[in-house]
């Protein structure tokens, strides 16, 4: 099999996948998206130096970089000729928190109470209704830009927070803050590949309430319960993804979906997983391409 790996940098995830490619004797090519050339009414469709991308068996998308509509459109074009993992439409839905909430809602999957608005007045109304809320940028990952706001804050403080947030991100994605069911802040990352939840971990908050490993959180192994398996698979499928990192949070009335990641890292999860995640992912990709 010939696999393209599209990424702006050769990070730990890419290196891990390359090791698996070498183990399984998969012919791979690391592709820098800025050097792809699209052709029309010519003798090629998509070219990378002297290689033709539509002659690959599959392309794996790791990191396109930010704010590149052209690169994303290239994926859509490429997907007409070969499988792209993850599918561009799925990446589009998962990278946009508003669209993620839309598809979770359409598929009747539990998520925290959420409102999305550009109005500062409406934002204040809903922060007060939730009593404690989390503001998130619609686009973003790793916990960056996320702000926790409480009802009891002075109105001047709330306005300052909201004005600064709006200046940066324009749109407010506001979720009720889910109070921890135990004594510590934690959530669950379930790693789903095709029809299988291959591993899961607890991400436990560091010095603050954010559980992201990139924000100082630590990881512990999480047993894959029937509830985790069922919800993670449904969330992945709702967004039209081949594989995903599904973030779940425990609440008094069961698990809720926080986020679905379409280009998730598995490096932190590998520390507590008995499964070699890169191997499992590549095995599933090979099966998919052959089917």
UniProtKB/Swiss-Prot annotation:
Q: Determine the domain of life of the protein's source.
A: Archaea
Q: Which UniProt keywords apply?
A: ATP-binding, GTP-binding, Ligase, Magnesium, Manganese, Metal-binding, Nucleotide-binding
EC number per UniProt: 6.3.2.33
What does the note accompanying the cofactor annotation read?
Answer: Binds 2 magnesium or manganese ions per subunit.
Residues bound to Mg(2+) 1 are 247, 259
Q: Which cofactor does it need?
A: Mg(2+); Mn(2+)
Q: Which residues bind ATP?
A: 136, 175-187, 203
Known pathway: Cofactor biosynthesis; 5,6,7,8-tetrahydrosarcinapterin biosynthesis
Q: Which residues bind Mn(2+) 1?
A: 247, 259
Q: Enzyme group, top EC level?
A: ligase
What PANTHER family would the database entry show?
A: BETA-CITRYLGLUTAMATE SYNTHASE B-RELATED, RIBOSOMAL PROTEIN S6 MODIFICATION PROTEIN
Q: How does it assemble?
A: Homodimer.
Q: What is this protein called?
A: Tetrahydromethanopterin:alpha-L-glutamate ligase
Give the organism the record lists: Methanocaldococcus jannaschii (strain ATCC 43067 / DSM 2661 / JAL-1 / JCM 10045 / NBRC 100440)
Q: Which gene encodes it?
A: mptN
């Amino acid at each position: 099999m010939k696999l393209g790996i599209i990424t702006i940098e050769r990070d730990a995830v890419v290196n891990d996948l390359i090791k698996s490619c070498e183990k399984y004797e998969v012919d791979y090519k690391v592709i820098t998206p800025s050097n792809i050339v699209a052709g029309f009414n010519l003798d090629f469709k998509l070219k990378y130096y002297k290689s033709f991308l539509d002659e690959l068996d599959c392309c794996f998308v790791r990191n396109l970089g930010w704010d590149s509509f052209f690169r994303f459109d290239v994926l859509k074009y490429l997907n007409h000729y070969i499988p792209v993992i993850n599918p561009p439409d799925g990446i589009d839905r998962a990278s946009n928190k508003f669209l993620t909430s839309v598809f979770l809602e359409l598929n009747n999957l539990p998520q925290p109470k959420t409102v999305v608005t550009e109005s500062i007045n409406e934002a204040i109304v809903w922060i007060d209704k939730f009593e404690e809320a989390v503001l998130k940028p619609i686009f973003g990952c790793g916990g960056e830009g996320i702000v926790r706001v409480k009802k009891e804050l002075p109105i001047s403080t709330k306005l300052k927070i909201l004005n600064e947030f709006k200046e940066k991100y324009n749109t407010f994605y506001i979720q009720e803050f889910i109070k921890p069911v135990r004594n510590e802040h934690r959530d669950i990352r379930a790693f789903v590949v095709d029809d299988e939840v291959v591993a899961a971990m607890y991400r436990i908050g560091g010095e603050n309430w954010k559980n992201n490993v990139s924000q100082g959180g630590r990881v512990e192994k999480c047993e894959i319960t029937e509830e985790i398996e069922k919800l993670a698979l449904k969330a992945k499928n709702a967004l039209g993804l081949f594989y995903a990192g599904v973030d779940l949070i425990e609440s008094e009335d069961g698990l809720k979906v926080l986020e679905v990641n379409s280009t998730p890292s598995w490096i932190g999860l590998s520390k507590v997983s008995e499964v070699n995640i890169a191997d499992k992912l590549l095995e599933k990709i090979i099966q998919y391409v052959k089917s």
